[in-house]
């Protein structure tokens, strides 16, 4: 944790931050709100996904986020017949779990984009949760990432007691987007191996109290030994 001009900040992602490397900056309160809402949706057995937004003049833009827009997970179109077939073509994992993957409802997406534009803010990145997988940027994440955005935030809730926030820089050709029911994929949930994807540090900033709440949420203490972080017990998958 460091203090910069009176503002307290800390790296809260697995990826460390070193001078000369890109990082994403977010207020600790925004990170905490994001985690809490994602956890509520996860407990309901659903997947979270949405948009991260910021004012165009914000420091570090577009590698920053000052607000979050959640889409209604009950409107996930992933299991509509056409989309379902395309996801099934990505491998066994996507045939086994019908909550693996998401497709935003077009009407909801349009309404959100209009509201964001009217507010004077801009979309800087998408985000979504991994309900069973670690905080990697998977093969299917790469294929479905909108190349208009330079980064993407993954929230792993594989162990809900120890959530993980990990942003990734993503470089894609504008025409490289989408999946098809003609694919014959396998292992699409595994990490994308190419140089087009790079993990970024996530630097949270704010009051000491907000930082403490966030770091405690991400790294809870073991009740048997308050000095030692709890050991995660990942779910299968």
In which residue ranges do the predicted regions lie?
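Conserved beta-strand-loop surface patch within small alpha/beta domains used
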Residues: 1-123, 131-237
